[in-house]
Amino acid sequence: MNVVFAVKQYISKMIEDSGPGMKVLLMDKETTGIVSMVYTQSEILQKEVYLFERIDSQNREIMKHLKAICFLRPTKENVDYIIQELRRPKYTIYFIYFSNVISKSDVKSLAEADEQEVVAEVQEFYGDYIAVNPHLFSLNILGCCQGRNWDPAQLSRTTQGLTALLLSLKKCPMIRYQLSSEAAKRLAECVKQVITKEYELFEFRRTEVPPLLLILDRCDDAITPLLNQWTYQAMVHELLGINNNRIDLSRVPGISKDLREVVLSAENDEFYANNMYLNFAEIGSNIKNLMEDFQKKKPKEQQKLESIADMKAFVENYPQFKKMSGTVSKHVTVVGELSRLVSERNLLEVSEVEQELACQNDHSSALQNIKRLLQNPKVTEFDAARLVMLYALHYERHSSNSLPGLMMDLRNKGVSEKYRKLVSAVVEYGGKRVRGSDLFSPKDAVAITKQFLKGLKGVENVYTQHQPFLHETLDHLIKGRLKENLYPYLGPSTLRDRPQDIIVFVIGGATYEEALTVYNLNRTTPGVRIVLGGTTVHNTKSFLEEVLASGLHSRSKESSQVTSRSASRR
């Protein structure tokens, strides 16, 4: 169950099926992002694709010597663009691939427009999602709900993305959903409808234990997306923002032109692949090792290129050297900027108090620490508001709740009204009234003992004590202990055996901390394979945008074969 591999396979197959010869790849805005996540431009160039164009671009030239591979979402807009294209074709022959199920009437419209008979084939290839990591996918949707209910357009897009994911992994799952969320139940029903309607597509070889799709709601854990992060990928997203593997460094003081935007992709960057889940402290020493390794391999200026053999060796090593030099400067810049922000915003202290708020139950200590940090001029309004949000969620119903006093402290610190209003919005979004589970107190004797022992021996790393609520949910699911009264099955049947292939989807967005949890569970649980997806992948900033978009605040204070379907063929 590798989503990067699944999407990569589809794109390889499209290019292979078009045969030898020069090609153009025609995409829309969304499929451009889908392709760029799994292939670099230079990799695709090696497959004789010499031109990349957008279907909505008005000024494309006529190039009759090129074959066109079209990879598009099956939207009305895209179908109209293709119809216009076929009436006045710019290329010699067209291979059309839709990223999801396309209606028969749309296929008929394409056939009628193809008077010059330039279409070689029309197929469905289900790469209709963003493959972020091998076990993490996103739909890049920010603001999926209005209040507690779906925005209809986003429900439709999410259903398409999730069913495409299932088809690309060849899974016809049983479905469980979070009972406390109306949105989770609605999505479960929509996915089930598609599976029933398109039953021929979902006829995969039966496995002994059927796969399981578990649909959750971000409202059940509003703590995780509010925390500062200390593992490389999660930290980069939290402090700099990752958008389709791209990081904008244009605001970094003294940044050179070629580093204003960098790409971090585990597919093409060995250092990133090896370090993305490591703690920030380890990254620092690994960067040092990378630098030292680079220094050893660096061609010495004095190195005499006397013989042809010397020159040949230099030229052969140079591309590798150049690539390594790019990797070194990129990671040194990124890590340098993370360090600068940690120091400038006093994030070590801030994060320690965040972890205390997320993991411990000492109210007076937490309150004292927040008040102390709110007095610190280095603590930004963003971080100050975030601390008060965590307090408001954790101690919402505590007998000594001091939220009004903290709100006054925020005002006195000069925190803008926007952030002050967000405190109540976050509680409205993910407070006790909404949650289907208890986020803070351990539920059974074993958990209470564990927490007590953890308190006694101290924690190895105070900055990474927190485990997302998803960890407990998946742990219970894997052990067959996830309560059916909280996470019912859709329909009459239930799973007797422990699940092996699990797809978890979070409405309202997943996080990189949760992706790390899934990565670790995959590594340490033999026989279990988990893929995590979300409407988006959040950092704190985007999560607060999600909360605002919901409008709630206004009311408060590996198989090698590819699943595809031929729509019509000539």
From Swiss-Prot:
Main role?
Answer: May play a role in vesicle-mediated protein trafficking from the Golgi stack through the trans-Golgi network.
Q: Which organism is it from?
A: Homo sapiens (Human)
Give the gene symbol: VPS45
* PANTHER family (alphabetical): VESICLE PROTEIN SORTING-ASSOCIATED (PTHR11679)
Gene Ontology CC entries for this record: endosome membrane; Golgi apparatus; Golgi membrane; membrane; synaptic vesicle
Q: Would the keyword Membrane turn up in this protein's UniProt record?
A: yes
Give the primary localization class. Answer: Golgi
InterPro entries attached here?
Sec-1-like_dom1, Sec-1-like_dom3a, Sec1-like, Sec1-like_dom2, Sec1-like_sf
What would changing residue 224 to N do, according to UniProt?
Answer: In SCN5; patient fibroblasts are characterized by impaired motility and increased apoptosis
Task: Give GO terms for biological process.
Answer: intracellular protein transport; vesicle-mediated transport
Protein name, please?
A: Vacuolar protein sorting-associated protein 45
- Clinical disorder: Neutropenia, severe congenital 5, autosomal recessive: An autosomal recessive primary immunodeficiency disorder characterized primarily by neutropenia and neutrophil dysfunction, a lack of response to G-CSF, life-threatening infections, bone marrow fibrosis, and renal extramedullary hematopoiesis.
Coiled-coil residue windows: none
| Record's keyword terms, sorted | Disease variant, Endosome, Golgi apparatus, Membrane, Phosphoprotein, Protein transport, Transport
Q: Name one Pfam family in it.
A: Sec1
Positions of disulphide bridges: none
The family annotation for this protein states: Belongs to the STXBP/unc-18/SEC1 family.
Phosphoserine occurs at which residues? Answer: 307, 441
Q: What's the domain of life for this entry?
A: Eukaryota
Expressed, tissue-wise, as follows: Ubiquitous. Expression was highest in testis, heart and brain, intermediate in kidney, spleen, prostate, ovary, small intestine and thymus and low in lung, skeletal muscle, placenta, colon, pancreas, peripheral blood leukocytes and liver.
Could you give the subunit structure recorded for this chain? Answer: Interacts with STX6. Interacts with ZFYVE20.
Q: Describe its membrane topology.
A: Peripheral membrane protein
Cellular compartments annotated: Golgi apparatus membrane; Endosome membrane
